[in-house]
């Protein structure tokens, strides 16, 4: 399992965003599209991995997958939970190592993504906050 440093997390997030059309706004496996938080007063709940095929779904899921985490590693009940909570459990139960700044970056981009910010913009904001 790969240690998740800030550089690793940024690269994995950029790689995930490169797979999507420019301006991609996250759609969870249930087909719900994140919309701007200011428009409806809330965001959506992301899924780290697709329950149907196990593929990474949200930005944090892509980062975890790049580090060697699969859907089978995600404890029951963590779909839609905050990334800090999940990371703490994966560190304890699976031996995942995540640097503090990487964990904060992942939380930031997850919150932005879930409120409808396009992936490239969420990553850019996360990078500017932590570099």
Predicted segment positions?
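Surface/interface-facing alpha-helical segments and adjacent flexible terminal/loop regions used
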Residues: 7, 11-18
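Active-site nucleophilic cysteine motif
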Residues: 51-66
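Catalytic phosphate/metal-binding cores of nucleic-acid and nucleotide-processing enzymes, i.e., regions
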Residues: 2-5, 23-32, 37, 41-49, ...
């Amino acid at each position: 399992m790969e240690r998740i440093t800030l550089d690793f997390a940024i690269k994995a997030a950029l790689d995930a965003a490169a797979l999507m059309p420019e301006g991609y706004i996250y759609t969870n496996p249930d087909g719900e599209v994140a919309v701007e938080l200011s428009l409806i007063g809330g965001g959506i709940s992301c899924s780290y991995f697709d329950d149907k095929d196990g593929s990474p779904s949200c930005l944090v899921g892509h980062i975890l997958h790049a580090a060697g985490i699969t859907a089978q590693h995600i404890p029951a009940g963590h779909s839609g939970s905050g990334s800090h909570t999940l990371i703490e459990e994966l560190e304890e139960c699976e031996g995942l190592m995540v640097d503090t700044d990487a964990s904060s970056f992942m939380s930031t981009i997850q919150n932005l993504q879930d409120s409808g910010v396009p992936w490239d913009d969420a990553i850019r904001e996360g990078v500017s906050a932590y570099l």
